Structure formats: structure tokens, C-alpha cells
Amino acid sequence: MNDVSKASLPKAIFLMGPTASGKTALAIALRKVLPVELISVDSALIYRGMDIGTAKPNADELKAAPHRLLDIRDPSQAYSAADFRRDALAQMAEITAAGRIPLLVGGTMLYFKALLEGLSPLPSADPEVRSRIEQQAAELGWEALHQQLQEIDPVAAARIHPNDPQRLSRALEVFFISGKTLTELTQTSGDALPYQVHQFAIAPASRELLHQRIELRFHQMLASGFEAEVRALFARGDLHTDLPSIRCVGYRQMWSYIEGEISYDEMVYRGVCATRQLAKRQMTWLRGWEGVRWLDSENPDRARKEVLQVVGAIAD
């Protein structure tokens, strides 16, 4: 698409960044001065009853700056990148029709990628194939199926853990249905996003600062009642660690503590480490991201001004 036709598209803003980088605070500050509406881009914030461990904006923040695509699923339900793209496009169209600008804020980079580039045409689930895979898993174990995937699609196997039956099963299912690997198919993009997007990423200047922010926030979550939140989820009886919700960073470690598998101190240590690993993955995505402007977490006022300099002109 050339620059002229791009300029005629409706505007949108992406505000990306690793966990604990100050994205939400900046988005709320921007909403006070720009005609924007916020859309959450976070695979954990979609779940109801998971507020503390996901650092969901509190009631006062949501009153000042409502976020769309929060609390849209029960923790027992799955939600895919395709689901997100469909829902986000609908929200963006609604916001644009009202004469405002969608500001998409979050750290789930796969969602941003799916929205920006479109999704590859993966085959629909096939209950018969899925059943056959589950039967194999019952007989041989998921480790053996992971070995099978390693031979078929080593790239996907390196990314998918043997203890992640949902994703492992899907990767095998895609191959058995289509004869093509998940890696091959995901290299084929679908429809690009029909918006002129201004992309920003916010992060601290150093890894050490980010690690400090992560550790501080994890301890703040614990002080705010994170354990009680997870105990309430545990007490439901229908949730387990194979679900994407309970595999969320922090929740998985607290779950292990509640089940008596690890001590409290070990839970804290693992929770902080897992959050750091998440931030590392997010930063890896962002460093390879094209067309992104970087903002400094440690100077939120300057970050706000930098966004306004770029975006102010499109908000008139």
C-alpha cells in the first residue's frame, strides 16, 4: 500500500511493552488529552475473577478510562488470537464510527501481530482427529507425541512444551488435517489491518530497572490479596493447570503452592522468575518489531509528551 492510500485510512495507536512497564498508566494519561478509546491487548486480562495477579486496572482507573475486551471470558474458557482479532476489529470499527481513535494497549505481542498482519488460514478443529490424538496420548503419553511433533515440525516443537497438551494437540491436528506444518501455515499471513497505525513501545532503559519493577509489583500483588484470589479459583473445582488461564504467569506458581507442591518462598521466587521470562520474551518480540517508537518508563511525563507530538496532529 502506498503512502497516499495509507493516509486515507482511519487512525489507530498501538501502545506495547513488557509487563510492569507502565503501559496502563500512560494509556489512561493519554485518554485525558486525546480523543481515544482504550482496547486491552492482553491474554490474561480477558478473564473474569483474575484481577490482582493480572494487574487489571482498578475500578477508579476503569471509571476514568474504560478498557474494552476486559472480563470477556470465564477462566474455564479458551480464547485464541483469531478470537481477539475478530473482537478487536469490531471494537475498532465502533470507536472509529463514533469519531474517536482506537488506542490498543497491552503486552500480548501475538495478538498485536495477528491484528496488524492478519492470521494464516489454519484448518478448523476436527473432533475425529483430535480424539485420535488424545487416544494416542493416553496410550503413549504426551512426551511421545512431542517427539512425533519434533520430527514433523521441529520449529513448533521447540516452542511448545511437552506439558502443554492443548497446543501440542493442535500442532499435530493441523498437520494431520492439512498435510502442512503449523510453522509453514503461520508464515502465510491473512488480511493486513486496514488502519494507519502509530506504534509505540514503553520500557525502562535497562533490564535491571525492569527486573526491579517486576519484583516490586509481584510483592504488591501478594500484599493486595493475590493468594486469596487464586484460592477462590482453586475452590471452584473445575479449573486446572492445562487451562490457559491457570497457566498465566503468577497463577501457575501460586496454584503449585496451594496444591502443596512448593513452599511459599519458592512460589514467590518462581513467580518473579516467570514474570522476568515473560518480559524477556516480550522484549525479544519488540526489538524485532518494525516501525515502533520507544518511550522510557522512568520518565512518564516525557513519554506522554512524545506520544502527543506524534499523535497530536492526527487528533485534531
Curated annotation (Swiss-Prot):
Reactions performed catalytically: adenosine(37) in tRNA + dimethylallyl diphosphate = N(6)-dimethylallyladenosine(37) in tRNA + diphosphate
Cofactor(s) annotated in UniProt: Mg(2+)
Annotated GO MF terms: ATP binding; tRNA dimethylallyltransferase activity
Protein residues bound to substrate: T19, A20, S21, G22, K23, T24
Annotated InterPro entries: Dimethylallyltransferase, IPT, P-loop_NTPase
Annotated site location: Interaction with substrate tRNA: T108, R130
Taxonomic superkingdom: Bacteria
Annotated binding of ATP, by residue: G17, P18, T19, A20, S21, G22, K23, T24
Quaternary structure and interacting proteins, as annotated: Monomer.
Protein name per UniProt: tRNA dimethylallyltransferase
Gene source species: Salmonella paratyphi C (strain RKS4594)
Gene: miaA
